[in-house]
C-alpha cells in the first residue's frame, strides 16, 4: 500500500505534468491524492518543496538506472552502448518522470535542492567512473573529463529525448539507438579497443 506522502508525490507529478509548475495548485494536488490540507502540510511546506522532493527522487531513480547498466565486465564499446540504451529505456518507460526531470524542473527551487542535486550528480559520476577509470588507464577510452565523456554519450540522445518529451518529435527515441551508439563510440572509444574486458578486438 502506498503512503500518504507517496500519494501526494504521485499526484504532484500528474498535476505538474498536465499544468506545469506555475499552473499547478496545492488544492488540485490534494484533491487528486485525496489528502486533507493538514496532511499536505504535514509532509510539505509548499508546492515548491513537494516539487523539489519529487525532482530529487526522480533524479535518484534515473541515476540508479544509469549506474546499474555498466559493470567491470563491459568493454568500452559495450559500456557506451549500455549507457545509451539505459538512458533511452528509462526516458521512454518513465515518460512523465522524464518530462518533469528534463522539461519542468527549475533551477530556482532553492539551495537545499541544488546541494542535494550536486550530491546525486557526484554519485552518478562516481558510479560511472568505477567502470570508466580502468578502461581509461588501459587506453581503451579516449582521455577526457567525466563531464565531457557523459555529454558526448548522453548529450545527443538527450536532444532526441527532449524533442520527444515536448511533442516536437513523435517517433520513439529508441529507433535511433544504433546511430546514437555508433556516433558516441567514435567520440569516446579508442580505435581497436576490445568489446569486452579481457577480450580481443
Where in this protein do the model-derived segments appear?
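Short, hydrophobic secondary-structure boundary micro-motifs
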Residues: 99-103, 144, 172, 195-197
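Generic hydrophobic, amphipathic alpha-helix propensity
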Residues: 4-12, 29, 50, 54-58, ...
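Amphipathic alpha-helical segments used for helix-helix packing
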Residues: 92-112, 129-130, 159-166
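Hydrophobic alpha-helical connector segments
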Residues: 53, 67-96, 149-153, 174
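C-terminal peripheral helix-coil segments that are non-catalytic and often amphipathic
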Residues: 86-89, 125-137, 156, 162-201
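Conserved hydrophobic residue
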Residues: 21-22, 141, 169
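Helix-turn-helix
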Residues: 7, 15-49, 53
